[in-house]
Amino acid sequence: MKGLKVVFIIMCAALLTLGLSVTANAFHAGGVAECMGCHNIHDAKSTSALLAGTDISSTCINCHGVTGASSYHIVTPDADMPAGTPPGNRTPGGDFGWLKKTYTYSPRAGSNVTEAGDTHGHNIVAVDFGYTADGTNLTAPGGDMDATQLSCNSCHDNHGKLRRLSDGTIATTGAPIIASGSYNNSADPAAGQAVGVYRLLRGNGSTAGSGGKTFSAVFNAVVPSTYNRSEATAPTRVAYGAGISDWCATCHSDMHSGTSSKMTHPVNQGLGTDVAANYNAYIGSGNMTGTNATSYDSIVPFQSDNTSDYTVLRSLADNTNTVKTGPATSDRVMCLSCHRAHATGWKHMTRWNNEGELIIVDGVYPGTDSPSAVGVLAKWAQGRTVAETSKAYNDKPATAYASYQRSLCNKCHAKD
């Protein structure tokens, strides 16, 4: 019996030394905590790290994919999204459930289109939940990471070691993590304390996760404390700061204007006078009467200059429609101005539909069940129900835009 106790103590010490992981609640407290939330010492499903799931992402989805759209859930279970029913979560990163939504429609006579679900986002591999590698791209677009290696911990540090110290330094050691640093109500750490970085994302100083990519940038951002919510009455404003596009370039370097020889859309560059003026004036197609004081659109967010000042970022993160100001000329376009991080209802994980001329017709979102004789047309509905189209915009009212609204590229470019 004494020998068994010694073995058990050694195993526990080994787990703690390796930093093996945590529950979802503990993760969102800022860093590593309850190891047994993800690991099973005697009856694991994965031999490599004694994981509770067959693989890393399956282990994550055990907590982040349960029924009910709330808080940290980012995967809607299959049973909750049958044909015609959209994924339920409205987190800023999007719901991975969109990867399972394939749409087939005929935009015109003799023309059939199939829009595969795996075109809607990052195809994490989570065998226990039926998520498989990208069926088209063998490597990350604009990069060389093996698509079969993509998992939640390719981007997130499942042990949450990266932290923000009291002097603002980002490090993997130096003080204990006392809480999350992701939210607009997150307190600044006192001397001898630290808070977790945004969403436990890997960054400068982190080790590589699945896929072997090492990040050299820090993803600075702040989100409202309530963020998985409908935007029917007020937007969810995430305050994005320095490092966003450089962080994405870790895997997608050839998609970025600063690291590619191709003709690509600028990122991590100031909007400048003309684009900032367009954004602030643009309300909808044909309506350029807006002002900077009320022009913010959560479907087309921007990076707040190049700041990593969390006092500034916290003041901008909002879900009450109180902070409505649009960009200054020094604010920046970033990857997440056009894309979400996980998945969306549209191809290439864009925030709005770029595969059609109009996103709103006859004053409503189009859909196969639309009451509008125009909105029901296949070239506008594109195989989706009204509920699916609306949810892809986080329930933002169609009336927020023009009755015949063109692509939201026009929020910056005003060509309509």
Residue map of PLM features:
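Bacterial N-terminal signal peptides that target proteins for export
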Residues: 1-11
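C-terminal segment of classical bacterial N-terminal signal peptides
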Residues: 14-24
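A motif-centric signal for short, conserved binding hotspots located
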Residues: 25-416
